[in-house]
Amino acid sequence: MSEPAQEYRLVLVTGPSGAGRTTAVNALEDMGYEVIDNLPLSFVPRLIEGPAIGPPIALGLDVRNRDFNATALIELIDGLTQDARVQLEVLYVDCSASELIRRYSQTRRRHPLAPAETPAEGVEREIDLLAPVRARADHLIDTSEMSPHDLKAELARWFDRGAATRLAVSVQSFSYKRGVPRGVDMIFDCRFLRNPYWVESLRALDGRDAAVEDYIRSDPRFAPFLEKLRELVLFLLPAQLEEGKAHLSIGFGCTGGQHRSVAVAEILGKALAEAGWPVSKRHRELERRAAAVLPTHQGEKA
């Protein structure tokens, strides 16, 4: 009986110029990844030809790539995700527009998308260009208030394969109307909880607001649900770690992805962090709304 084929472990690293992508790929190289920077997108499929041997690969991609465009990158991500031989993670190194402009002004560098214009014009253009890619990221790290040392430490939490005693957990909220996120290991449906949307004073808020959380907690079904959820997840995490898993993604869905799923993701994330597990949080629909309203949006820390 033949053994199952080994998986390629591939991390795609992207994000706006000046956010820290180069620092990120250098940090991954220090962790033992084979780093390939600015490879043309059309060449990437060649990386997974033949047997999967050697260290995991970190592939740096940005707007300076010769054939870069967001649509092509998303198509590449879709293709790699569907390939059973590939274990893919997409890392988006983000930064607020104001901080990117400050960094460009401080270093007096020209922006690659606007070499003859102001840094602000290049930054705005690049954030708009990369918005669809940002929405597809598995890991989102906002470096707006990070030093290079802080970024390296955060990356080590998620990607240091030598840290066999760690299991990184991500919790994310989403709207069922927009589909289930890819790459989620466990999904919990929060639509049975009382919906704050129907309370006029809560409609414009989201699950991170105390008033919304209090309303959801007032549902008599919430407390037993949270107790059982916390007990289940804390039971499963050590078992997942024993199986060699480095990352576990937990999704929470509701109708609009604004109130119930966000609140539950926040509450469970806090409970897991208090129990000692590295946790990151993402709220997909809130990120999409922020990107649509304000093109030069500030990145949300994962």
Swiss-Prot record:
GO molecular function: ATP binding; GTP binding
Residues where GTP binds: 62-65
Classification via InterPro entries: P-loop_NTPase (IPR027417), RapZ-like (IPR005337), RapZ-like_N (IPR053930), RapZ_C (IPR053931)
Organism domain of life: Bacteria
Binding residues for ATP: 15-22
SUPFAM superfamilies (UniProt xref): P-loop containing nucleoside triphosphate hydrolases
Keywords: ATP-binding, GTP-binding, Nucleotide-binding
HAMAP family attached to this UniProt entry: RapZ_like
Known role: Displays ATPase and GTPase activities.
Family of the protein in this entry: Belongs to the RapZ-like family.
Protein name: Nucleotide-binding protein Rsph17025_2562
